[in-house]
């Protein structure tokens, strides 16, 4: 093997090792995950939105059904809401990993209104697209927000 061939081989091997390690151990997240995803000029408005639903078995069941079905949240965030690469089927390589809804720090940092705003407008700089009114009604979005809050209790 030539010197150049060895360098190419070692570079490819190193790339595979990094890929396998990040795949095996998942995405740990970063402090940036806690920064608001709503633009600063809209944050106060988003935080003022109030969830009209009180958590109940019926509302949580509706939110779960939407999360796992019609809104296909679980395709990226996973059935357990762990985000990272746990769901990942729709997350392209190199993209920002989906939010970990089960993270206590994230649950404390994010208001229901911010989550609702993201469902309505999407999240700039991520693969999170807007879902209202194309896929979800406002009530359905709030039901999903209510369900996402349950990940913080698991």
Label the predicted regions.
Residues 17, 51-52, 62-65, 104, ...:
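Generic anion/oxyanion-binding catalytic loop in active/binding sites
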Residues 36-68:
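Electrostatic cytochrome c docking/interface patches
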Residues 153-154:
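Short, solvent-exposed mixed-charge patches
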Residues 58-82, 88-91:
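Sequence/structural segment immediately N-terminal to covalent heme-attachment motifs in c-type
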């Amino acid at each position: 093997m030539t010197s150049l061939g060895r360098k190419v081989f070692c570079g490819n091997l190193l790339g595979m090792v990094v890929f396998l390690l990040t795949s095996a151990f998942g995405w740990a997240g970063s402090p940036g995950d806690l920064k608001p995803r709503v633009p600063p000029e809209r944050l106060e408005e988003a935080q003022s939105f109030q969830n009209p639903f009180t958590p109940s078995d019926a509302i949580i069941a509706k939110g779960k059904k939407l999360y796992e079905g019609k809104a296909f949240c679980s395709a990226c965030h996973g059935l357990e809401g762990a985000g990272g690469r746990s769901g990942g089927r729709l997350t392209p390589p190199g993209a920002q990993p989906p939010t970990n809804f089960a993270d206590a720090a994230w649950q404390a940092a994010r208001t229901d209104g911010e989550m609702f705003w993201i469902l309505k407008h999407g999240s700039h700089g991520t693969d999170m697209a807007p879902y209202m009114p194309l896929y979800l009604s406002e009530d359905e979005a709030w039901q999903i927000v209510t369900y996402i809050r349950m990940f913080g209790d698991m």
